[in-house]
Each structure stands twice: as structure tokens, then as C-alpha cells.
């Protein structure tokens, strides 16, 4: 799937064995999985907070725009994150 074909009605869910959380020792959000940990940058952490298995990508974009203002790049940033996260097997898109 590429960015032009991406369906913002898809709902991202964390894959089994992957857990998103704030890690004080890392001073940021991380994804924990059986083999280790991925430290997320601030933007990825902001997006990850809204992945709850009920919000579709469009709703996540709307919530981030409400939180940070109507920044045009938010749409592309969220879609890029979803594509990378799916490619890395962190999330499923259903």
C-alpha cells in the first residue's frame, strides 16, 4: 500500500505482543515487544497515543489537528507513520 492509495477509514491496532507506553527512563514514548524496545520521537509518540483499536486514521488526524492546530503536514505525517508502523509489523490496519 502506498500513500496515494491509503484508506484513512482503516483502524490501526497494536499487534499482539507490542505495547505502547510512556517510559520515564527514556523520557518518552516507546513500543515494547518481546525482543526489545523502540524509542519513538515526539511526533510518533503523539500519534501512538491515539492508536486504541477504535479510532480510524481520519479520527486520529482530526484529534492531532485539534491538539496541535490545523498544520497541513499532519495528514501526511500520520499516513507515513501508519505505513512505516505496518511495514515494521508494529500495527495492523483493519
UniProtKB/Swiss-Prot annotation:
Zinc recorded as keyword: no
Keywords: PQQ biosynthesis
UniProt-listed GO biological process terms: pyrroloquinoline quinone biosynthetic process
Pfam families for the chain: PqqD
Record pathway: Cofactor biosynthesis; pyrroloquinoline quinone biosynthesis
Membrane-spanning parts: none
GO molecular function: quinone binding
Domain of life of the native organism: Bacteria
UniProt record similarity statement: Belongs to the PqqD family.
NCBIfam families: PQQ_PqqD (TIGR03859), PRK02079.1 (NF002535)
Subunit relationships: Monomer. Interacts with PqqE.
Function: Functions as a PqqA binding protein and presents PqqA to PqqE, in the pyrroloquinoline quinone (PQQ) biosynthetic pathway.
Protein name: PqqA binding protein
Amino acid at each position: 500500500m502506498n500513500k496515494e492509495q491509503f484508506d484513512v477509514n482503516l483502524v490501526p491496532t497494536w499487534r499482539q505482543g507490542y505495547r505502547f507506553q510512556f517510559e520515564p527512563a527514556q523520557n518518552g514514548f516507546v513500543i515494547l515487544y518481546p525482543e526489545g524496545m523502540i524509542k519513538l520521537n515526539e511526533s510518533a509518540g503523539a500519534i501512538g497515543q491515539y492508536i486504541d483499536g477504535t479510532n480510524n486514521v481520519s479520527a486520529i488526524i482530526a484529534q492531532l489537528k485539534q491538539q496541535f492546530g490545523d498544520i497541513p503536514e499532519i495528514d501526511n505525517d500520520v499516513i507515513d507513520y501508519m505505513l512505516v508502523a505496518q511495514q515494521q509489523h508494529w500495527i495492523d490496519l483493519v
